[in-house]
Structures are given as structure tokens and as C-alpha cells.
Amino acid sequence: KGNYFNLNQKIYNKNKDFKDFQFIIIAPDGTQDEVKEILKGLNDLTNVSKWLFVFAPENEIQEYYNTLHLKGKLNSDFGTSNVYIVDKKRNLRGRKDKAEYKEGYDASSPSDLYNEMTDDVKVILAEYRLALKRNNAKRQI
């Protein structure tokens, strides 16, 4: 639950008003009641309309995780404390250069979320705004 609180405070609340921003959490089948409790707690803090949960069998979660080609592994509950930025085209976003390689952000670390994920979310949202401006300019011509 602490990880969801960290995400909510450091990332979600700052970006929830952007049309294209949402959280999608993939969770194992059978955790629906636990998720309801998490959402109930978050609902006291924020509008949870952009917190979306997808429930799937454990093997499908593992298969999806494998398609991302991540260095880390899922734990025995088919989860991880890491969160990832996936863009509209379903590309994994992060920091790719060797000096500061980062494919995910540790949700149990408020400083990781605040110092790094915040900046990386700003970058992708700026890209979306720029693309929208370009498209609108082309329509006016």
C-alpha cells in the first residue's frame, strides 16, 4: 500500500489533469478484493478515475513482462516494486544511456519517484503537447 501512496503523492497528483496520463496496474487474478481496499484508501486522497487495474492469470502477467525485455524479474507474487513508463505506442520509456540507465522506477523510494520519474514523465508529456501543437498547426493551414 505504501508504494501506491508514494506513486499517488509524487507522480499521479501532479499529472492527473493531463488527458493522456493514466496509471495501469497489472495484478494477478484473485487480488480484486485487495485492489478494492487500495482504491478505497486512495479515493480518500485523490480522484482515482485514472488508476486502472487489469487482472490476469499469473502466466499471462509473466508473458507480458517478458515482452518488455526488462533486466529485473517478477517476485513470487508476480509483482515488483518497480513501475514503468509505457507510451501511447506501447514503448517502454526510461533512461537508456549507460551513465544513468533506468528502465523502471522503485515505487518504494519516494526520492526515486520524485527525482527521476517526475522528470521522465514531464519529458513524455511535453512530447505529447508538442505533437498536439504540430497537428493543430497543420489543420489550420
Enumerate the predicted regions with their spans.
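Short, charged low-complexity intrinsically disordered segments located at boundaries
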Residues: E34-K36, L68-K73, N91-A99
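Structural microenvironment flanking redox-active thiols in thiol-disulfide oxidoreductases
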Residues: G2-V54, E58-Y64
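Thiol-/selenol-based redox modules, centered on thioredoxin-like
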Residues: G79-I141
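Glycine-rich loops and low-complexity Gly/Arg-rich segments
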Residues: I11-D17, N47-W51, D77-S81, S109-S111, ...
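Surface-exposed short loop/turn segments
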Residues: P57, E63-F78
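Sec/Tat-exported extracytoplasmic proteins
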Residues: I11-N15, Y65-L68, G72, V121, ...
